[in-house]
Amino acid sequence: MAVYTDIAEDDLKWFLTEYDAGTLLSYKGIAEGVENSNFLLHTSKDPLILTLYEKRVEKTDLPFFLGLMQHLSARGLSCPLPLPRRDGALLGSLSGRPAALISFLEGMWLRKPEAKHCREVGRALAEMHVAGDGFELKRPNALSIDGWQTLWEKSEARAGEVEAGLQDEIRGELDFLAAAWPKNLPAGIIHADLFPDNVFFLGDALSGLIDFYFACNDLLAYDVSICLNAWCFEKDGAYNITKGTAMLEGYQSVRPLSGEEIAALPVLSRGSALRFFLTRLYDWLTTPEGAMVTKKDPLEYLRKLRFHRQIKSPAEYGLSL
């Protein structure tokens, strides 16, 4: 979450009249994240999240995102729900941006997740994959192989500002992944961004998943690899196999991975590491000064990518083969 667009209090109060949301008491921007402008609203009824969708989010994708949250919630997954307007629409407009009100989910994200939390995340990810079955809208993954190439082309000329010699390494990685990427693994709805700040806990109990604005149709095991990258590395860059084992056991307690999915994990993990390296690199080079947004270090994911290149067997992630 982040704030790129400011809102005037009078405009917000007028916006809220289109909803059965109560009277505005207070609001504040939320700085975490990089995609949209988000605000926490306190009203005379319930707290709400107001999201203004910025230019990177295609307006035509919003029915998919908002409808998916409704679909998953109806199937028992704990996630935010969009609040309909009085006319039944899920989407409004505020400060020149498409805007939606989303229910507030109780809980906090973990700054120092442990293996027991990784197990819960693995289980919740699998539950989301199962619950997503039957959702009729489709959204291709814009941040897969073709999207990575486009991002790299936008960043390549300045990549040396982050680390010398990146051009040859990343071009080689893109070529490898284009040739090695699996094509016939189980696919469905994936979250595609299930980082610690998108998972809420109350104590040690997982209370819900948030931020579905990268969700799309893609390989389910690719989503697993994203979580391995996001949850199972320590601050010093070391892979924590105890966390990896817990994550994978939690996932497979709900949806066992096929042999083909397990064999593909090293390639998928290289791909997901490259994906987040490239988006972080692009944001690092292009985010305007003064934006209320937390920029993230792209080199963290370059180090993870280099780790995955050294993997000889999926067992090194903590799988029992």
Curated annotation (Swiss-Prot):
EC code(s) of this entry: 2.7.1.39
Keyword Acetylation: no
Functional pathway: Amino-acid biosynthesis; L-threonine biosynthesis; L-threonine from L-aspartate: step 4/5
GO molecular function terms attached to this record: ATP binding; homoserine kinase activity
GO biological process: threonine biosynthetic process
Entry keyword set: Amino-acid biosynthesis, ATP-binding, Kinase, Nucleotide-binding, Threonine biosynthesis, Transferase
Reactions the enzyme catalyzes: L-homoserine + ATP = O-phospho-L-homoserine + ADP + H(+)
One Pfam family in the UniProt entry: APH
Family, as annotated: Belongs to the pseudomonas-type ThrB family.
HAMAP family (alphabetical): Homoser_kinase_2
Protein's UniProt name: Homoserine kinase
UniProt source species: Rhizobium leguminosarum bv. trifolii (strain WSM2304)
